[in-house]
From Swiss-Prot:
This protein's name: Uncharacterized protein aq_1828
Annotated membrane topology: Multi-pass membrane protein
Keywords: Cell membrane, Membrane, Transmembrane, Transmembrane helix
Coiled coil residues, start to end: none
Transmembrane regions listed in the UniProt entry: 8-28, 45-65, 72-92, 109-129, 141-161, 176-196, 203-223
Predominant localisation class: membrane
Gene Ontology CC terms, in alphabetical order: plasma membrane
Organism of origin: Aquifex aeolicus (strain VF5)
InterPro entries: DUF4010
Family: To P.aeruginosa PA0043 and M.thermoautotrophicum MTH1451.
Pfam families: DUF4010 (PF13194)
Record's subcellular location: Cell membrane
């Protein structure tokens, strides 16, 4: 598909973020090497697709167990708000390079095999989660969340929301598990951009990866202290 202009690129990121922010990140990272003068625009567009992922996670959680929404938003909103502010700053800084001319080809992020893949991942994670919860407690859920988030964020989100709704795991555990899945997914995408993106994009996502690690580690420490004191 051919896309022209700043508006079209941003729209592509927003629409593409609905099924897969990972696909958007990969596509735009690859394009940034050819159109390096648009690195700020690509970064801004990628972060927008991540923001769509955030709203998707909130939406899925609300459908399954709305009682989790408050804690999940409390954990994730500051992170995505700061990312968006950073992206807007860079976008405005590099605005003079965002020419309307030229065209680029972007692969469609949708795939006919997505539904089958999602079902397979969900079933696998569901089986593993019961084993880990039984043998390793909440820590097993956290490990599973972090690892599964690399592959698919939707499956682990739906699963943890369902388990929390049934009372099999606590709301705090489910919310922290979803947080870990989101962060591992963002770290994976950041890593891809660092490896395959333009020089500027590499630097921008190095900051994102570092911020993600600091944010996640801080919340884990606070979460552990709160649980120890309760």
């Amino acid at each position: 598909m051919k896309y022209k202009g700043t508006g079209s690129l941003i729209l592509t990121a927003l629409i593409g973020g609905i099924p897969s922010s990972t696909a958007v990140t990969m596509a735009f990272s690859n394009l940034s090497r050819k159109f390096s003068y648009l690195s700020e625009l690509f970064f801004f567009s990628i972060i927008l697709s991540w923001l769509v992922m955030f709203f998707r996670v909130i939406f899925y959680t609300f459908i399954i167990f709305e009682g989790m929404i408050y804690k999940l938003v409390l954990l994730l909103l500051p992170y995505f708000a700061l990312l968006l502010m950073f992206a807007i700053f860079l976008y405005l800084k590099g605005n003079k390079n965002h020419e309307e001319g030229g065209s680029m080809s972007i692969k469609n992020p949708f795939s006919l095999s997505q539904a089958f893949t999602f079902g397979l991942i969900y079933s696998t994670i569901s089986v593993i989660s019961h084993y880990l919860k039984t043998h390793f407690g909440d820590e097993g859920i956290y490990v599973l969340s972090f690892l599964s988030g690399i592959m698919d964020i939707d499956a682990i989100t739906l699963l943890l929301a369902r388990l929390s709704d049934k009372g099999e795991i606590g709301v705090d555990v489910a919310a922290m598990g979803i947080l870990l899945a989101v962060m591992s997914n963002n770290l994976f995408k950041s890593g891809y951009a660092i490896i395959f993106g333009s020089k500027k994009l590499k630097i921008y996502f190095l900051f994102v990866a570092l911020f993600t690690l600091i944010y996640t580690t801080t919340l884990l420490i606070l979460f552990d202290k709160l649980h120890m004191s309760s």
